[in-house]
C-alpha cells in the first residue's frame, strides 16, 4: 500500500477510500506513481533533483488548491508546491509529500487602462510577457522566460527592468492566497497587510499563492538587446569597463556580465566571454559612440569580437 509522509515524521496509509475521497473534491487529476503522467509532473528544471512525492494534484483552479490544502491539514501531511519548478534547490518537490502542481494554472488577464495584469501562479515569465506586450506593457520579471513567476516574485525577483523599476516584489499590487487552513484571502497593502508584507520577498511559507496582480509600465513591443562578446584574455579590462558603465548608465539600460562561452554566432570562438545588454530606449549607439573617444579600455565596447 502507498504511504505518505506526515509532518511529525510518521507515515499515512493511502487507502483506496482515502484517495477516492480526495479525487471527488478535485477538478484536476490526482496522480500516483502508477500514473503515466506522474514522472513528468514531478520533474523540475534542475534534473539533479530526483524526489518522489506520494501523490501529485495537478490543480486546474483555486478550488483544487483549497481542497488539497484542507486534505493535507486534516491528515497532517507534508505538502510541497510546484509553480514553475525552476528553483535550483528543488524546493517544489519532497519525498513522500502531497505535491500541488500549479503548472496548468497559466491564465493572464491584462487591464490596459489601469495598467494591471493578473497572472495565475503556474505562469512562467514568457506567459506574462506575451500577454502584456500585446498592449505595449510589461512588468518587472526575471531574465529567463521559462522561470516561474511565483518563486521569482515571492523571493523578491529582479531582471531586465529592475534598474528602472525595482524588484518584482516592489511591483506586486495584490495576491490571492490559500491559507494553511484552506481559506482563500486577498492580500494587498490595505487588506491582510501583514500577510502581503511577508509574502513580498519572504517566500511561500505563509500559504499557497494562486495569483498575482502586477503593476505594468509602457515598454516595447520593440526593444533593443543582445550579446556582446570579447576574447577571454580581455576579461580584466572588460570587467573594469562593465563596472564603470554600470555606474554611469541610465536606468533604462541593463548590463549583465557573464564569464562563460559566448553563444554560437559568426566570429565567436570558444575562448570568448559574453556580456548581455538589454534596454528599451535607443541608448546603445550613443554609448558605443562615446566609447570610441575614450581609453583603450573603453574602446573594447566599440570593438568586440562579435555581437548577436
Which positions does each model-derived feature cover?
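Short acidic, glycine/serine/threonine-rich loops at helix termini
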Residues: 91-94, 151-154, 221, 269-271
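Mature extracytoplasmic enzyme cores
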Residues: 21, 29, 118, 281-284
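C-terminal cap/substrate-recognition region of VAO/PCMH-type FAD-linked oxidoreductases
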Residues: 138, 175, 180-308
